[in-house]
Amino acid sequence: MKLKPIEVAEILQKEIANINCLSEIKEVGQVISVGDGIAKIYGLANVKSGEVVEFKSGVKGLVLNLENDSVSAVIMGDDNQVQQGDNVKRTKEVLEVPVGKALLGRVVDALGNPIDGKGDIASKEYRHIAMKAPGIIERTSVSEPVQTGIKAIDSLIPIGRGQRELIIGDRQTGKTAIAVDTIINQKQAHSLTNESDKIYCIYVAIGQKRSSVAQIVKKLEDAGAMDYTIVVSATASEAASLQFIAPYSACSMGEYFRDNGMHALIIYDDLSKHAVAYRQISLLLRRPPGREAYPGDVFYLHSRLLERAAKMSEEKGNGSLTALPIIETQAGDVSAYIPTNVISITDGQIFLESELFYKGVRPAVNVGISVSRVGSAAQIKAMKQVAGSVKLELAQFRELESFSQFGSDLDPATKAQIDHGKRLVEILKQAQYRPLPVEEQIISLYVGTKKYLNDVPLQKVKEFEDKMLTEIRLNKKDILESIKNEQRITEETEQKLKAFLENFVKAYCVMP
């Protein structure tokens, strides 16, 4: 039987229509060279900057350089698994990480994979790591406080929700200790049912020792703070690419809380090592070096990260993301490249000094050059009532103390002012991992500023404070409750407090 051409065409059309096969176009390139965590790839003509590519071994890469005839990608994992000649395929995706409450209590790597041995994370939502910072209209001014539990900070350098406050100082001056204390201090708010009081915490370890990260996680677990904390770890032994993306990944996790009307606090520990990792990547990508061999866009590296911290407007849910970046200085040099960059991006800095630390003033906050540019608007009225004069009194004390070294003859008024200053410094000292509720801080500062400590020997100020707070917790709870609920010291509360303190000072001074 002879078929006509038109019949042949119809049969072929039917057969083709019955074939249920979708052809998938894959763009595949080839690795030209690989080394130091960088792969040079030929053949991916349409790949975009910031796109994820997949190597033959399953390891992922992030495209950072687009050149005339090739592209360069940083390998996010073990570069020994990538060899010259391997095929590389486009994923047509940008880098995403899991977000949500399922991550709370977990330790994850820079890509959001769990590394704590507690099984998979059941997260339903993913977010891009390089999200755009909120615009001006979407934001509102900082108005609610973040209580760190540290007297020297909550009274003199207050931090507000949505603020970016830099913690800067030499190594071993207690920068991480302030950050960890702030996380532990949020436990009190998490014991309440009101969601608007709670602050979820994210701690990002960049280029730290594994032992240090394990120690911090252990401390947070012991304090019961891991229940509301995510730890993102990109340790010194991991690829520079993972250290580079870790803060952005963690920031996306924090933005989930911010954009859903909740409050989050993110700690970047530390951005000096982050800049070093980015410098390493940039130099290996043959980008031109600038000052201190950092690339020209190192300012943008940190500004695009820190601008994502914000207090959102009412229309956007009233959420907030507060950032505490940490910078390590060399021999107290705050005028180096990275410290000055981050100081200019943030809304203030807490400067920790080695000299004060070795003198036993801990936390070693230099009150003179530490500043909070927006936090005072968030400070509660009760704290303003007692802390208003502290900064000035401490500045006058430092000046008088430096002059008193030159001569021994001091008039009684100057001597009294120096003695008062020494007691103020003493009352601002605080043990590590012992954050105080704000109402107890207010009472301690009230005692210091109203000169109740003048008759207490200097070496016994800490003992006096501990005994006084214990007595108030046991027998004068109404004073604490009044300050906590009213958020100010009412006349009635002040009268009660004065009567209690006068009796307590008399009783303490006659103690053996």
UniProtKB/Swiss-Prot annotation:
The record marks 370 as: Required for activity. GO terms for cellular component: plasma membrane; proton-transporting ATP synthase complex. GO terms for molecular function: ADP binding; ATP binding; proton-transporting ATP synthase activity, rotational mechanism. It holds the Pfam family ATP-synt_ab. It is found in: Cell inner membrane. It is a peripheral membrane protein. CDD domains: ATP-synt_F1_alpha_C, ATP-synt_F1_alpha_N, F1-ATPase_alpha_CD. The keyword Ligase does not apply. Keywords: ATP synthesis, ATP-binding, Cell inner membrane, Cell membrane, CF(1), Hydrogen ion transport, Ion transport, Membrane, Nucleotide-binding, Translocase, Transport. Its main location: membrane. The keyword ATP-binding applies. Belongs to the ATPase alpha/beta chains family. F-type ATPases have 2 components, CF(1) - the catalytic core - and CF(0) - the membrane proton channel. CF(1) has five subunits: alpha(3), beta(3), gamma(1), delta(1), epsilon(1). CF(0) has three main subunits: a(1), b(2) and c(9-12). The alpha and beta chains form an alternating ring which encloses part of the gamma chain. CF(1) is attached to CF(0) by a central stalk formed by the gamma and epsilon chains, while a peripheral stalk is formed by the delta and b chains. This is ATP synthase subunit alpha.
